[in-house]
Amino acid sequence: MLPKNPIIGLCQQASFLISAAKVDQCPEDSGLEVAFAGRSNAGKSSALNTLTHASLARTSKTPGRTQLLNFFRLDDERRLVDLPGYGYAKVPIPLKQHWQKHLEAYLGSRESLCGLVLMMDIRHPLTEFDRMMLDWSVASGMPLHILLTKADKLAFGAAKNALLKVRQEIRKQWGEGISIQLFSAPKRMGVEEAQMVLAGWLDLLPQEDEESAEEA
C-alpha cells in the first residue's frame, strides 16, 4: 500500500495562476514545475484534473482547445503546467506552428521544469509527437513519465499487453530511464502511482519514498 501522498493536500488548494502565449509571459522562473504534454485527444486535461482532484484544466469535446501554456499554483515554490495539445487536424497550420515554436522555447529554456508527464492514448501510442517528446527528454536529461491514458477502453489483459509492448519499444529506442504506467481518468486507474511520481519530482517525499517512486 502506497503511503499518503503530500501532494494531495497541495492539489486541494491548487489554483489557476496565469496563461501564457509565449515564454516571456510565463511566471518567474523559480521553484519547481511539472509539465503535462500530450497529443490532442489523448486525455491530457482529464488526466490533469483527475490527478489534482480539481477542475483545473479545461476539458472539451473539441481536441486542441487548450492553446496556451496554463500554469497552476500548488504553493509558492511549486507549479503544474498544462501544455498545448498538438496534432488535431482541424487546427490551422499557422496556429500549429505557433504552438510548436513556443512549446520548444518553453522546454528549452525553463530552469524550473523538473519533470514531464506525457499522455498517450493507449490505443494509439508512440505518435510522431510522442516520439519527438521522448527524443527531447533523453537529449536534455529531463525526467519523463508516461501515462497510457484511456486504459479502460481496453480489456484488462489487452491493456497490460499494450503496456508491455510500449515499454519494450521505449526501452529499445530510448533506454531504461523513462517510466510508464496504465491510466484511466474515469476509473481513477493509476492515480496514486502517478501522484507519487509528481511528489518525487516536486521534492515532497522523504528520500526513500522518492527512490521508490522513481522505480515505479
Curated annotation (Swiss-Prot):
Among its keywords, does the record have Phosphoprotein? no
Residues reported in the UniProt entry to bind GTP: 38-45, 64-68, 82-85, 149-152, 182-185
The protein's matches in InterPro entries, at most eight in alphabetical order, are given as: G_ENGB_dom, GTP-bd, GTP-bd_ribosome_bio_YsxC, P-loop_NTPase
What this chain does, per the entry, is described as: Necessary for normal cell division and for the maintenance of normal septation.
Residues recorded as binding Mg(2+), renumbered to this chain, are: 45, 66
SUPFAM superfamilies per UniProt = P-loop containing nucleoside triphosphate hydrolases
Question: A single GO CC term, please?
Answer: cytosol
Kindly list the GO molecular function terms attached to this UniProt entry. Answer: GTP binding; metal ion binding
NCBIfam families xrefs = GTPase_YsxC
Q: Identify its protein family.
A: Belongs to the TRAFAC class TrmE-Era-EngA-EngB-Septin-like GTPase superfamily. EngB GTPase family.
Q: List the PROSITE patterns hit by this protein, alphabetically.
A: G_ENGB (PS51706)
**How is this protein named in the record?**
Probable GTP-binding protein EngB
Question: Does the keyword field hold Signal?
Answer: no
Cofactor(s) the protein requires to work: Mg(2+)
- Supply the alphabetized keyword list: Cell cycle, Cell division, GTP-binding, Magnesium, Metal-binding, Nucleotide-binding, Septation
UniProt record, GO biological process: division septum assembly
The chain positions of domain EngB-type G read 30-204
Which HAMAP family does this UniProt record tie to the protein? GTPase_EngB (MF_00321)
